[in-house]
Amino acid sequence: MEFKKRIRIISVKEFRIKFSTEENCLDYLAKLRWPNGFVCPKCQNQESYRQAERGFYRCKACDNKVSVIAGTVFHSTNLRLTDWFWAIYRMAQDKKGFSAMQLMKEIDVAYPTAWSVLHKIRCAMEERDKQYHIKGRIELDDAYLGGKSKGKRGRGAEGKVPILVAVEKRQTRNGTKPGYVAIRIVKSLSSVEVKDFVDSKIVPWSIIETDALSVYGILDDLDFVHESFVTENGIKAKELFPWVHLVIGNLKRFILGTHHHADPKYLRLYVSEYCYRLNRRFHEDDLFEHLLKACLLISPRKHNILGFRKNSL
């Protein structure tokens, strides 16, 4: 298989040809994991023998046996890599979201297996996005997701999960446009949660625009420039903060449209999926490869917090 040029997925047909066998998938994973050739994690030697066993290499210097999928999202998997690659491809290509029910039908596996595969991929998305921060002029707002109650709407709505959403507001010749996005599910809408969110996701001395809700007052005491706006006298919040409201609206439609039966326990992973894809909307041609790399980088321990049974995949 040729690796001199980055693969750009154009069609399902092309994908099926390039990754039609386990061997093709293993070769591609090895190229991504060791772009300059095999490196033994034990002695740093670069010479190895390819083993007949699935994805294993043996170091010529110290005889260390290394698996290309060890320590990744594919660690100890019993599922074919061709099916894993297909799931990652579908997650990368489908802007509206991809459900476990769809994957179950497409690769002919049990629903729990399809569900686990997609959630492990979402864990990789979540871990990857934790490394990045947003900066510049930021719109910051809160919202509520989910809930079956038809009672109170808006802030404090019953049975709903609070979130904080921050969106870069980039200047253009004709006005502004949204940049990168950060979203977090919080236990409650409080000053403590606001502080923790902005400290971990926004570069210091960025300009943060909010409404006049009291919990945002904490920003005045932090290393940011805080601009607070009172949304009254006919001025609507959507007019003052158009981009963050657009992101919130699209997030709600994403969850209701594809994951409307989502367990609140895993809601953060659906939010992570939405945020990951949104932040890479300008690099859609490369999204499959980026997501595959994210799956190689995540530790197996990270996705075990979801309660997956060992060797269930």
Predicted features and spans:
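Residue-level recognition of single "structural anchor" positions
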Residues: 1-313
